[in-house]
Amino acid sequence: MKVIGLADSELESSLRKAGIGMSASEARSIASILGRDPTLAELFCYDAMWSEHCSYKSSRAVLREFLPTEGPNVVLGPVEDAGIVSIDDEWCVVISHESHNHPSQILPNEGAATGIGGIVRDVNCMGARVVATADPLRFGDPYGRESSRVRWVAEGVVDGIWQYGNALGVPVIAGDVVFSRCFDYNCLVNVVAIGVVRRDEIIRSRAPPGSGEKGYDVILIGKPTDSSGLGGVIFASDTLREEEEEANRGAVQIPDPFLKNVLFKANEDLFRLVREKGVEIGFKDLGGGGLTCASSEMGAAGGYGMEIDLDRLHVAGEFPPEVLCIAETQERFLIIAPRELRERILKIYNEDWDLPNVYEGARASVIGRVTTHDRYIVRHRGEEVVNVPIKHLTGGIRYERVWRPRIRNLVEPDVRMPEDLNRVMLDMLASPNIASREHIYRYYDTEVQGNTVIRPGEADAGLLAPIRERDFGIALSVDSNPFYGRISPYWGGATAVAEAMRNVAAIGATPSTLTDCLNFGNPEKPEAFWEFRESVRGLADAARNLWLKGHPNQPVPIVSGNVSFYNESPEGAVDPSPVIACVGIMRDISRAITMSLKEAGDGLYLLGPRFDELGGSEYYRLIWGVTGANVPVVRFPLERSMIYTVIDAVDREILRAAHDISNGGMAITAAEMCMLSDHGISIDISDLGDMRSDKLLFSESSGFVVEVADGAEQEFVSIARSYDLNPVRLGSVSTGDIEMARDGKMLVRLDPEEAREAWSSGLREAMR
């Protein structure tokens, strides 16, 4: 394709007509390296590999500057498809975190389903058994001007997740959902998957050492390649425009969970074969960027070149080479294996698991080889259509983006004290951002595989016991608050980390690792890039300062993640949304607790003082229609002490329930502990300071409300004080109403059934 000698305007026009999204300067850079005009197929390959989605060209420098990715428990950091941390000397947990935002806004069902499909492949290709997923979701205002579209998107996304996940047989054990007008035109569908693998059975997503010298085979398995998902990574690296919606539908992939299920079982046989033979293979899923991305990255990661013959692909029709290279057809993996295993591998997929009869055209095919040269070469019908330096293709391009603080001029509102706090409580319990998520997770098979210990909605984190002969469990939580990010991207990032860790601690698990999915607007806009940079700085500071328990001054490592830019439309960008997942390890699952109250007469304690921090709170936004300015901040030593106190108290079996304080503040936290129990509460906030009662009740400063077993209160206070905390006894669990008093005056008295009805119906009504 002509590049050299064209004026910028001519070149840009030529690129767009060909369906290529790169800039004229990027095309010129490619031509300069090659010393010639690139072929059309080469430009398509570079367009995918140099996209924001694949290359991290705007974000990589910031991530490297700030994020802590190493720690004493890290086995594999964020260099391949998933991160790995140790559980003990034998077992490891594998985790990956991705986004599928743009596809889910255009085709909600297919977009969400393929998001789940892609993330479980990322974990499986490390040799792991996939044991759970999580789904942090962000939708527009269900009562706003785009309510019909918002509800259509939300319903489609939930359907896509449960239809794919249930058919695949992987439980959803965690997730959250936030509704805000800023997501009207850009929903966020982030997905997390975790798996388990023995340390000595980990498989890497790279060409193994010696594979180039020995000419290892490259084997493609799964669905026949078609044109579905073509340009998906380019589509994900641009701003959504309503007038282009129909044209973008082709960039959304088509899922097939039943084929995926068979592939996972066949992969187990592959892993068994590899162990028996004592050989190392490379294994990688085909996601964004398709065949070109998977094959070139595997070759480059191993320090080798790659030769691919497109005529040997199993395909679903006639397609030009550029389509075969970058189409994002789902349910595919790539294997790099010794030639002597070729026939055994082909037999596993084509005969033992009979892929051609599971899905028309599906199979395993040898499509190329690893080489010792440094080129990425693709042939089609006997001709070279791609011949480029492999490290140049995979190395991407880097931009030093300009950043400039966004000035919002936010102020604290002067609101009056509500006359009827009962009404305020009921309205907040019914808010779509607080109400029970049962309307969503009732569709999910949360107990498939039989490993689930704590299901979604029962506690702040999900918990499963994936290894039957072991006592340990794996906890998972996901968190982010875009309303905090709107006020302060830095504290939005820090609070997301802190809350994710609190949620894991609330069941008694010890935070072990973090992942991030960073959802922001256009990085070419200085204010948007500043928001991104500040959020990363905030979450990194929290990870560094909250520490791995038992390892002072060691950060909680961030081992996997994703950056999703261009989450904006002509109406504007989404609020800064760094979504954090936290994995925790529970050494003895029999000691885990939930959030529901257990015994009348038990003491209720508050950990964490209340501050005048209602900026971005549900109280300000829902009741008064304002944002505020005093966003919750993370006081790192205090936060660390609260988390450690709860973990130790659960381990000593003196806590019966715990719930972290976040959306809605202490009052909503305490009321939610009644929702799944037959108990009420009687608490008094007289000893909490001089702030006005509504601020004490609804401030979203971090903390916990915990139920302490009768007779164990002194021991609990002793644990807390060992961490320099002064827990406050709020009151006790009762058999009556939800009561909150101050200085002899009853502030709140709610019938638990009335409160439960508001809480259980809020999300159902919003999505009706």
Swiss-Prot record:
NCBIfam families: FGAM_synth_II (TIGR01736), PRK01213.1 (NF002290). This is Phosphoribosylformylglycinamidine synthase subunit PurL. Its EC number is 6.3.5.3. One of its GO terms (cellular component) is cytoplasm. Pathway: Purine metabolism; IMP biosynthesis via de novo pathway; 5-amino-1-(5-phospho-D-ribosyl)imidazole from N(2)-formyl-N(1)-(5-phospho-D-ribosyl)glycinamide: step 1/2. It is found in: Cytoplasm. It is an enzyme of class 6 (ligase). Part of the phosphoribosylformylglycinamidine synthase complex involved in the purines biosynthetic pathway. Catalyzes the ATP-dependent conversion of formylglycinamide ribonucleotide (FGAR) and glutamine to yield formylglycinamidine ribonucleotide (FGAM) and glutamate. The FGAM synthase complex is composed of three subunits. PurQ produces an ammonia molecule by converting glutamine to glutamate. PurL transfers the ammonia molecule to FGAR to form FGAM in an ATP-dependent manner. PANTHER family: PHOSPHORIBOSYLFORMYLGLYCINAMIDINE SYNTHASE SUBUNIT PURL. InterPro entries: PRibForGlyAmidine_synth_PurL, PurL_linker, PurM-like_C_dom, PurM-like_C_sf, PurM-like_N, PurM-like_N_sf. It catalyses: N(2)-formyl-N(1)-(5-phospho-beta-D-ribosyl)glycinamide + L-glutamine + ATP + H2O = 2-formamido-N(1)-(5-O-phospho-beta-D-ribosyl)acetamidine + L-glutamate + ADP + phosphate + H(+). Belongs to the FGAMS family. GO terms for molecular function: ATP binding; magnesium ion binding; phosphoribosylformylglycinamidine synthase activity. Mg(2+) 2 binds at D122, D285. Mg(2+) 1 binds at E98, N562. ATP binds at Y56, D516, G561. Its main location: cytoplasm. Keywords: ATP-binding, Cytoplasm, Ligase, Magnesium, Metal-binding, Nucleotide-binding, Purine biosynthesis. The active site is at H53, H100. It holds the Pfam family FGAR-AT_linker. GO terms for biological process: 'de novo' IMP biosynthetic process. Substrate binds at S99, H100, N101, H102, R121, Q253, E328, T329, Q330, S564. Monomer. Part of the FGAM synthase complex composed of 1 PurL, 1 PurQ and 2 PurS subunits. It comes from the Archaea.
